[in-house]
């Protein structure tokens, strides 16, 4: 192979830098596990694992983009290389086979990837499309059979709430009584009622899609919406940061 040009040398230098970053991240995680007593917090471990994952992803993308160059390169020592004093490093550079442990990891990863590709139990694209077409209507029908937000389900109310064993020592009130009291309190206020979706069904005819039933909310549902709106709102960015790093979001 001819001598390397500046772009190829730059590619090798970028590979070295990425591998050094990964090595330092792994050493930092191992050191924190071996030296910390008690062990580091979950958020700290999650943060270090995220850094290692990003380093691995960066190396994988870099090696894939420069696969042709890296597969054509051949390492050999020059006349000025200190082979006697740097013999271990030279052996690693001239090694043609993977380390036995690394080779075992690679073989297990390849077997897992092959089994995932051969998995015939997964749904096809047409089956997934049919599932997503069926799910909204069926979920809405099931939701309308439930009494969301109450102390008792519809099945428990049908068989009598006095026969329900809740395991609680406090007295649960019937929702009908609460709704009648709230209705009497809201009489004469003259507030404008917002419309809400109470049903969904598949549109008949040649046109595809769903159609929704619109109705005014009941006093009980309005009260539930006010209770939900009173809760603290967490920004989506804080939620995603908590999912990836484990750092609890700050309520605003």
Curated annotation (Swiss-Prot):
Cellular localization per UniProt: Nucleus
The keyword Nucleus appears for this protein: yes
Cellular component annotations (GO), alphabetically ordered: core mediator complex; mediator complex
Disordered, as annotated region: 170-252
Coiled coil: 6-30
GO biological process, one term: regulation of transcription by RNA polymerase II
GO MF annotation list: RNA polymerase II cis-regulatory region sequence-specific DNA binding; transcription coregulator activity
Keyword entries, A-Z: Activator, Coiled coil, Nucleus, Transcription, Transcription regulation
Cysteine pairs bridged by disulfides in the record: none
Acidic residues bias locations: 173-196
Membership in a protein family: Belongs to the Mediator complex subunit 8 family.
Role of this protein: Component of the Mediator complex, a coactivator involved in the regulated transcription of nearly all RNA polymerase II-dependent genes. Mediator functions as a bridge to convey information from gene-specific regulatory proteins to the basal RNA polymerase II transcription machinery. Mediator is recruited to promoters by direct interactions with regulatory proteins and serves as a scaffold for the assembly of a functional preinitiation complex with RNA polymerase II and the general transcription factors.
Subunit structure: Component of the Mediator complex.
Matching PANTHER family: MEDIATOR OF RNA POLYMERASE II TRANSCRIPTION SUBUNIT 8
Name used for this protein in its record: Mediator of RNA polymerase II transcription subunit 8
Gene name, Swiss-Prot/TrEMBL: med8
């Amino acid at each position: 192979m001819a001598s390397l040009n500046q772009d190829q040398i730059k590619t090798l230098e970028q590979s070295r830098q990425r591998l050094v970053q990964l090595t330092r991240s792994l050493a930092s995680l191992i050191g924190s596990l071996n030296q910390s007593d008690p062990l580091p917090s979950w958020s700290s471990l999650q943060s270090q694992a995220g850094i290692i994952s990003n380093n691995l992803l960066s190396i994988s993308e870099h090696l894939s983009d420069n696969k042709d160059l890296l597969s054509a390169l051949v390492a050999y020592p020059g006349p000025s290389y200190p082979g006697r004093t740097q013999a271990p490093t030279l052996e690693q550079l001239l090694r043609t086979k993977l380390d036995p442990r690394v080779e075992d990891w690679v073989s297990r990863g390849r077997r897992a990837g092959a089994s995932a590709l051969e998995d015939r139990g997964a749904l096809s694209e047409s089956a997934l499309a049919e599932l997503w077409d069926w799910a909204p209507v069926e979920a809405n029908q099931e939701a309308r059979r439930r009494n969301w937000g109450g102390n008792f389900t519809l099945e428990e109310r049908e068989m009598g709430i006095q026969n329900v064993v809740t395991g609680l020592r406090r007295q649960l009130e019937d929702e009908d009584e609460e709704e009648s009291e709230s209705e009497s309190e809201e009489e004469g206020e003259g507030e404008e009622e917002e419309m809400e979706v109470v049903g969904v069904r598949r549109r008949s005819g040649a046109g595809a899609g769903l159609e929704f039933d619109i109705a005014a909310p009941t006093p009980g549902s309005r009260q539930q919406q006010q209770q939900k709106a009173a809760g603290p709102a967490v920004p989506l960015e804080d939620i995603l940061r908590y999912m990836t790093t484990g750092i609890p979001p700050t309520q605003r």
